[in-house]
Amino acid sequence: MPKIKTNRGAAKRFRKTASGKIKRNSAFTSHILTSKTRKRKRQLRSSSIVAAVDQKNIARLIPYK
């Protein structure tokens, strides 16, 4: 059996934690920041865990990470 290819876009966006969950960063942080409040920008800096519904599909995209 050949190796499964890693989806390079997903590899740059997601990381697996030690417990096997998948971590992601928030969107809406790259530009047009003047209209966003200080509080909103601060909260967007924190990372979060991918929803349970999406875990399986994303794990398939990054098999070796």
Curated annotation (Swiss-Prot):
It comes from the Bacteria. The keyword Ubl conjugation does not apply. This is Large ribosomal subunit protein bL35. Residues 10-24 have a biased composition (Basic residues). The keyword GTP-binding does not apply. Pfam families: Ribosomal_L35p (PF01632). NCBIfam families: rpmI_bact. Coiled coil: none annotated. InterPro entries: Ribosomal_bL35, Ribosomal_bL35-like, Ribosomal_bL35_CS, Ribosomal_bL35_sf. Keywords: Ribonucleoprotein, Ribosomal protein. GO terms for biological process: translation. PROSITE patterns: RIBOSOMAL_L35 (PS00936). Residues 26-35 have a biased composition (Polar residues). Gene3D superfamilies: 4.10.410.60. Residues 1-47 are annotated as: Disordered. GO terms for cellular component: cytosolic large ribosomal subunit. Belongs to the bacterial ribosomal protein bL35 family. GO terms for molecular function: structural constituent of ribosome.
